[in-house]
C-alpha cells in the first residue's frame, strides 16, 4: 500500500499514545494496529522478540518497551501518529515527555488485573497534562479476566468516570467479541480467522440482551445530560441517532469528563478494529486541543499563542532524542504551528541558538520515510540539529516563541562506574554524553572525593539498561559499583540574622563582602526546591552584587552540612550587608553567599531525607503474614490491604535503601509465588539512628 500524502485536513489526524502497566499488552496492541492499518505484512510478537515498535536489542530481549518510537499509519482515510510508551516505572521520563506532545491516549488495562500501580502513575501523569483518553480492557481471553471488575477499579483507584461503550461477548477461552452499545449490535470474530481481519456484525446474543439494555441506558443518560437538545429528545422518548451519540461521546471525551471503555484481546486479534474506530470517533484532532501557549524569549510574562494551522509562524517542540545507527542523532519534534522545509534555518528559542534542519522523516518505528516539509499538527524526526535537547522549542527566527517545557524528576538511585582500561575511558565519556542527551532523567556527576564517575537514574532496571547500552552500542567495558541511594538534606526551622563577612587583605586589591540572611524551610510548587528574595534597601549592597549572593548560596546547596548530600527546600532572604568601594567584587559576594548558607544551614536543625517507594506486593494468602512482617522489618509502613483475583495485595511505603535485593528475599519467602512493583513516592526524613549511620559512612568514621 503506497503511503498517502500527509493529510492537509487536520481534522483527520490523531496524535495519540498507548499507555499502560508493564504487562497489559501495549506493544502487542500497537503491533495489531500496524497490521490492520496495512503497514506490517507479518504480525510481530513480543513473545518471539520481533515486535516492530520495540527496536532496541534489549527491548526485544526483555519483552518490554523502553524508548517510545513514533509511527505514522492510516485508518479509513484518517492519519494516526502513534507513540508507544514504556509502562515500566523506571521509564517515567519517556511517558512524561510523550504525554506532553500527544493530543489523546488509549489506556490499556489487563482484563484480569484491572488498575495496577503503574497504571495509576501513568494515569496521574496524563491528568497533569489533561490528555483525553479512551480505555481498552485487553487480555479478555485470559483465565480470570473480568471486564466489570476492571471498570470498577477505574472508578475506585483512578477516580475516573469510566463509561463502557462495549461489553464482552463470552469470557476467557470463549471470548468471541464485543457488544457495541452505540450501534446496539455485536461484533464477533468467529472460527480461527487466524489474524482477525474480518468480523461479523450480528444481533446481540439473547443472554446479553438485558445487560446490554442496562448499560445502554447508563450511556444514554450520560450522553443526554451533555446537551440540552439531546436531553429534550431523550426525555421525550425519541431515539437518539448513532451520529448524535457519537458526537456527544466525542465532546465529553475531549473535555476529559468521561473515559469511554472498550474491550478485546489484542493477542487473539479480537476487538482491535473497533478500538481504532473509537480513536478516530472520540479522540481529539490537533484542531480540538487548545492552541499552543508559550512566551517570548527571555520575557516570561509576555504570552504568545500559536494556533494549529499552517498559516501561523513555525513552532515545534523537541520531545525526544535518539541515536540512530546510520544517521546519528535523531530529534523527534511535534510541530504545533506553521510549516518548515528540510534544509531551512530555524532558531532554538529556548537556547537562543540557530539550527539548520537536515532531512525530515515520518517514522515507522525504526524505518524512515523522507518528507520535504514538516507541517502543523504532525510528528517528525529530523537529523542535523546540534544544540537541541529534550524540551527545547524550535521556532521561526523572525517570530520567536518558547513553548512550555517538561519537568523531569531527580534520580533516586546512583551507581559508581569505572572504565576497565584507558581506551574505555574515552568511550565511556562519549556514551554518557550520548545517553544523557537522550534521557533527561539520566544524571552524571564526578564524586569529588573518590574521583569516580557516578550515574543516577529512576530505578535499578533503568540503570541496568543504561549500562547495558554502554556495553552494546558503545562497546564500553566498565565495572559498576553497588547501587547507592540518592539522599538529600533539608532544614526544619527558621534561623534569623545569620551574618558572614568575607575579607582578605593581603597586599594589592583585597576582597570584602558582608551579608546577613534569614534561612527557612520552603515548599514550592511541584519541582521548586529553592527560593531567593532580597530585602536589601538603600544600596547597602549594590544591585549588581545581589545575583552573586544567590549564585553562591546555590553552589553551597550542592553539598549539605551533615553528610554532603544536596540541600533542598530552602528559602534564603537577604536582609542586609555591607560592601567596600574598592575591595568588593562579584566573586567576594559569591563566596560570602556560599559561606553564610553553610553557616545558617548548620544552625537550622538540618536533617537527611531519603526516597520512599510506594510498594505493592501481590501474594497468596498463606504468605501474607511473612510478607507484612518482612515489610515492617524494612521500616515499611503498611498503607492498605485488599483482596484481588483470589490473592492478597499489600500496599506499603518503604524506604528505597531497604528495598535492595528484595526480589530474591520475596521469592524465597513465598516460594516464588508473590510478585511486587514499586514506584517512587516522595522524600521523607530519616529516623535519627539511620541518620547517624549515614553521616558516619559519609564522613568516613
Swiss-Prot record:
UniProt KW Zinc keyword: no
Primary localization class, coarse: cytoplasm
Keyword Lipid biosynthesis found: no
GO MF annotation list: GTP binding; GTPase activity; translation elongation factor activity
Keywords: Cytoplasm, Elongation factor, GTP-binding, Isopeptide bond, Nucleotide-binding, Protein biosynthesis, Ubl conjugation
GO cellular component: cytoplasm; peptidoglycan-based cell wall; plasma membrane
Gene3D superfamilies: 3.30.230.10, 3.30.70.240, Elongation Factor G (Translational Gtpase), domain 3, P-loop containing nucleotide triphosphate hydrolases, Translation factors
Gene Ontology BP terms: ribosome disassembly
Entry superkingdom: Bacteria
Function of the molecule: Catalyzes the GTP-dependent ribosomal translocation step during translation elongation. During this step, the ribosome changes from the pre-translocational (PRE) to the post-translocational (POST) state as the newly formed A-site-bound peptidyl-tRNA and P-site-bound deacylated tRNA move to the P and E sites, respectively. Catalyzes the coordinated movement of the two tRNA molecules, the mRNA and conformational changes in the ribosome.
Membership in a protein family: Belongs to the TRAFAC class translation factor GTPase superfamily. Classic translation factor GTPase family. EF-G/EF-2 subfamily.
Protein name: Elongation factor G
Native organism: Mycobacterium tuberculosis (strain ATCC 25618 / H37Rv)
Chain's gene name: fusA
Amino acid at each position: 500500500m503506497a503511503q498517502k500524502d500527509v493529510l492537509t485536513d487536520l481534522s483527520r489526524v490523531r496524535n495519540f499514545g498507548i499507555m499502560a502497566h508493564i504487562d497489559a499488552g501495549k506493544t502487542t496492541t500497537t503491533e495489531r494496529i500496524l497490521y490492520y492499518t496495512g503497514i506490517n505484512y507479518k504480525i510481530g510478537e513480543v513473545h518471539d522478540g520481533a515486535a516492530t515498535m520495540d527496536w532496541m536489542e534489549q527491548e526485544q530481549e526483555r519483552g518490554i518497551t523502553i524508548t517510545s518510537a513514533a509511527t505514522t499509519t492510516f485508518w479509513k482515510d484518517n492519519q494516526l501518529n502513534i507513540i508507544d510508551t514504556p509502562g515500566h516505572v523506571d521509564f517515567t521520563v519517556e511517558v512524561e515527555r510523550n504525554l506532553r506532545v500527544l493530543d489523546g491516549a488509549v489506556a490499556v488495562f489487563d482484563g484480569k488485573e484491572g488498575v495496577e500501580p503503574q497504571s495509576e502513575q501513568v494515569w496521574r501523569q496524563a491528568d497533569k497534562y489533561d490528555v483525553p483518553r479512551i480505555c481498552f480492557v485487553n487480555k479478555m481471553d485470559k483465565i480470570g479476566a473480568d471486564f466489570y471488575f476492571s471498570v470498577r477499579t477505574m472508578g475506585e483507584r483512578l477516580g475516573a468516570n469510566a463509561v463502557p461503550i462495549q461489553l464482552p461477548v463470552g469470557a476467557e477461552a470463549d471470548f468471541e467479541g464485543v457488544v457495541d452499545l452505540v450501534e446496539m449490535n455485536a461484533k464477533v470474530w468467529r472460527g480461527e480467522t487466524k489474524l482477525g481481519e474480518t468480523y461479523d456484525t450480528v444481533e446481540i446474543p439473547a443472554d446479553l440482551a438485558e445487560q446490554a439494555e442496562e448499560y445502554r441506558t447508563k450511556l444514554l443518560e450520560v450522553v443526554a445530560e451533555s446537551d440540552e437538545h439531546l436531553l429534550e429528545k431523550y426525555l421525550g422518548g425519541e431515539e437518539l441517532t448513532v451520529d448524535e451519540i457519537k458526537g456527544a461521546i466525542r465532546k465529553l471525551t475531549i473535555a476529559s469528563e468521561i473515559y469511554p471503555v472498550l474491550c478485546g484481546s489484542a493477542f487473539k486479534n479480537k476487538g482491535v478494529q473497533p478500538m481504532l474506530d473509537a480513536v478516530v470517533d472520540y479522540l481529539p484532532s490537533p484542531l480540538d486541543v487548545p492552541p499552543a501557549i508559550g512566551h517570548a524569549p527571555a520575557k516570561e510574562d509576555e504570552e504568545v499563542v500559536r494556533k494549529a494551522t499552517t498559516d501561523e509562524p513555525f513552532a515545534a517542540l523537541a520531545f525526544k532524542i535518539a541515536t540512530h545507527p546510520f544517521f546519528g542523532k535523531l530529534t523527534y519534534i511535534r510541530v504545533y504551528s506553521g510549516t518548515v522545509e528540510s534544509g531551512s534555518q530555524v532558531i532554538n528559542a529556548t537556547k537562543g541558538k540557530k539550527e539548520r534542519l537536515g532531512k525530515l522523516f515520518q517514522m515507522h518505528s525504526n524505518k524512515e520515510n523522507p518528507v520535504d516539509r514538516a507541517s502543523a499538527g504532525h510528528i517528525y524526526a529530523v537529523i542535523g540539529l546540534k544544540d537541541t535537547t529534550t524540551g527545547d522549542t524550535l521556532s521561526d527566527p523572525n517570530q520567536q516563541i518558547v513553548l512550555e517545557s517538561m519537568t523531569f524528576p531527580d534520580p533516586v538511585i546512583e551507581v559508581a562506574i569505572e572504565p576497565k582500561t584507558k581506551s574505555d575511558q574515552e568511550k565511556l565519556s562519549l556514551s554518557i554524553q550520548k545517553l544523557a542527551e537522550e534521557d533527561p532523567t539520566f544524571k552524571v556527576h564526578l564524586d569529588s572525593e573518590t574521583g569516580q564517575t557516578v550515574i543516577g537514574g529512576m530505578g535499578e532496571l533503568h540503570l541496568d539498561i543504561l549500562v547495558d547500552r554502554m556495553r552494546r552500542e558503545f562497546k564500553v567495558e566498565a565495572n559498576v559499583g553497588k547501587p547507592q541511594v540518592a539522599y538529600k538534606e533539608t532544614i526544619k526551622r527558621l534561623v534569623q540574622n545569620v551574618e558572614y563577612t568575607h575579607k582578605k587583605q593581603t597586599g594589592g586589591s583585597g576582597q570584602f563582602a558582608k551579608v546577613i540572611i534569614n534561612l527557612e524551610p520552603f515548599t514550592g510548587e511541584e519541582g521548586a526546591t529553592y527560593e531567593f528574595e532580597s530585602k536589601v534597601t538603600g544600596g547597602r549592597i549594590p544591585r549588581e552584587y545581589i545575583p552573586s549572593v544567590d549564585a553562591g548560596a546555590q553552589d553551597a546547596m550542592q553539598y549539605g552540612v551533615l553528610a554532603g548530600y544536596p540541600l533542598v527546600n530552602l528559602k534564603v532572604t537577604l536582609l542586609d550587608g555591607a560592601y567596600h568601594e574598592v575591595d568588593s567584587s562579584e566573586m567576594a559576594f559569591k563566596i560570602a553567599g556560599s559561606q553564610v548558607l553553610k553557616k545558617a544551614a548548620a544552625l537550622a536543625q538540618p536533617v537527611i531525607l531519603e526516597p520512599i517507594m510506594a510498594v505493592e506486593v501481590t501474594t497468596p494468602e498463606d504468605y501474607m503474614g511473612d510478607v507484612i512482617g518482612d515489610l515492617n522489618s524494612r521500616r515499611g509502613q503498611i498503607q492498605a490491604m485488599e483482596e484481588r483475583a483470589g490473592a492478597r495485595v499489600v500496599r506499603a511505603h518503604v524506604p528505597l535503601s531497604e528495598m535492595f535485593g528484595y526480589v530474591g528475599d520475596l521469592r524465597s519467602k513465598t516460594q516464588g509465588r508473590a510478585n511486587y512493583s514499586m514506584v517512587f513516592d516522595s522524600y521523607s526524613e530519616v529516623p535519627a539512628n539511620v541518620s547517624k549511620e549515614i553521616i558516619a559512612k559519609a564522613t568516613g568514621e
